[in-house]
Structures are given as C-alpha cells and as structure tokens.
C-alpha cells in the first residue's frame, strides 16, 4: 500500500519546517552579532537553487512528479520563506536601516535568482 501524495506533501512540509528552524538556530549568533538577517537570506538562496534543480530534473523526467510535489512543494515550500523575508525587511526599515534593507532586498532577489538559474542549469546537465 503506497502513501497518498498529499501525505508525502505533508511529511515534506514537516521536514522543511524543521530544517528551516535548525538553520535559523544555527545562524542565530551571526544574526545577533551583525543585525543582518543572514539566516533567511541563506535559507532562501539555498531553497532557490534546490527548487531550480528539482524542477529541471522532474521536467526532464529524471525524477518522478511525486518528487516535485514532495520535495519542491513540501520540503522547499516550508523551508523557504517570503513572509519572513518581508517582515525582516520591514523591521530594518522601521529601525532606520534603509541601506541595510536595500542590501538585503537586492541580495535576496539577486542571489535567489542566480541560485535558481544555477540549479536549473545543473539539472539540465545531470
């Protein structure tokens, strides 16, 4: 008897949420020392790379569609976080750190897009 796809999706979401929290805790000293939201930046960039790779490999049929749902939507959907990025950006602006907010936004979008493209390119070659 196989698990229904929705159950794999839910399990993937649980794994992604736990991994994100572990990464946040691991990087908490860096964030506290610098005041820069490095944890969410790194989480989102890594997630962008892994999603680009996953979509390339499932799109080519190397991995089954269930992997896209379980890993792409479940794990990576829970691991990455646009809402936390947005609220951290807002917090920087509220504290009068406009330059840091601009750097955070530019790095998040620029590195995230670069990582997604790199994942897609790697997936096309595997």
From Swiss-Prot:
Q: Which reaction does it catalyse?
A: fluoride(in) = fluoride(out)
Which Pfam family name is an example for this entry? CRCB
Write out the GO biological process terms. cellular detoxification of fluoride; fluoride transmembrane transport
Q: Where along the chain is Na(+) bound?
A: 77, 80
Keyword vocabulary terms for this entry: Cell membrane, Ion channel, Ion transport, Membrane, Metal-binding, Sodium, Transmembrane, Transmembrane helix, Transport
Q: What family is this? A: Belongs to the fluoride channel Fluc/FEX (TC 1.A.43) family.
- The protein's name is Fluoride-specific ion channel FluC
| UniProt source species | Deinococcus radiodurans (strain ATCC 13939 / DSM 20539 / JCM 16871 / CCUG 27074 / LMG 4051 / NBRC 15346 / NCIMB 9279 / VKM B-1422 / R1)
Lineage of the native species? Bacteria, Thermotogati, Deinococcota, Deinococci, Deinococcales
């Amino acid at each position: 008897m196989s698990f229904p796809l929705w159950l794999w999706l839910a399990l993937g979401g649980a794994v992604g949420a736990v991994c994100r929290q572990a990464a946040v805790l691991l990087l908490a000293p860096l964030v506290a020392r610098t005041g820069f939201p490095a944890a969410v930046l790194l989480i989102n960039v890594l997630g962008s790379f892994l999603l680009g790779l996953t979509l390339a490999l499932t799109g080519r049929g190397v991995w089954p569609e269930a992997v896209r749902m379980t890993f792409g939507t479940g794990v990576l959907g829970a691991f990455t976080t646009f809402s936390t990025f947005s609220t951290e950006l807002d917090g920087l602006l509220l504290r009068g750190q406009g330059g840091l907010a601009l750097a955070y936004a530019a790095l998040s979008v620029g590195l995230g897009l670069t990582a997604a493209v790199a994942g897609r390119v790697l997936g096309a070659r595997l």
